[in-house]
Amino acid sequence: MLAIISPAKTLDFETPAPNFPFANSQPKLTAYSQQLIDICKQFSPAELGSLMSISDKLASLNVARFAEWQLEHNEQNSKAALFAFKGDVYTGLDAETLTQAQVEYARVHLRMLSGLYGLLKPLDLMQPYRLEMGTKLVNPKGKDLYAFWGDIITQHLQTAMDEQGDNILVNLASDEYYGAVKPQKLQATIIKPVFLDEKNGKFKQISFYAKKARGMMVRFILETQPTSVEQLKAFNYGSYWFDEDASGATELVFKREEQA
């Protein structure tokens, strides 16, 4: 079973990563990352702010990040992706409290999609950046990052699928990031967990809760190491429960009553 998740806009490069006795890994697709960096370096703060719809302060920060980005990734300029991303998904995942065995399992069974890096293993080193997959960054391959990455992410995802040993892919990424995957080109049964929260008597997807729940589902996978879709249905973290009637063969619906 392989799970995929989105990255996060919020990053933490100040807090030291937990110390495990295995080495961090090198991101595989940095030759492509360098091409994107070279394009992004050409933007002024105002141009980048307009492209990314971000504040002047964030635009200036990311112009500096693009200028400082280096092809070589080491312990001084980088941090393992699993511990660098901080956002709602990663709050639910709570990577800092994973055991050594769970992190080892994650190295094989978890991947992060990325606008800049394409596909990251949990312990791949990464440098601070902001480049969302939906950014309309014109490049030699087309009008946006979906055109830039083409089949590359899908091919590397297939390699990861082959290495981990079965054909179950658990899609816990946002639609924006999953759009960079070409499911028809994957030899995989793709399972999509959906998390619904009760609001005024009706169950609906609430972005903040759904993101956190996706992280909790990753945590559940790393802790329980399920080998079948049936075992995923046992997920009950955060008071969610599996709704058999609302689910289908590849869409697993989890619900939670309104929080008091």
From Swiss-Prot:
Q: Which biological process terms from the Gene Ontology are attached to this UniProt entry? A: response to hydroperoxide
Pfam families, per this entry?
H2O2_YaaD
Q: Which InterPro entries match?
A: YaaA (IPR005583)
Give the record's GO CC terms: cytosol
Family, as annotated: Belongs to the UPF0246 family.
Q: What is this protein called?
A: UPF0246 protein APL_0602
Source organism of this protein record: Actinobacillus pleuropneumoniae serotype 5b (strain L20)
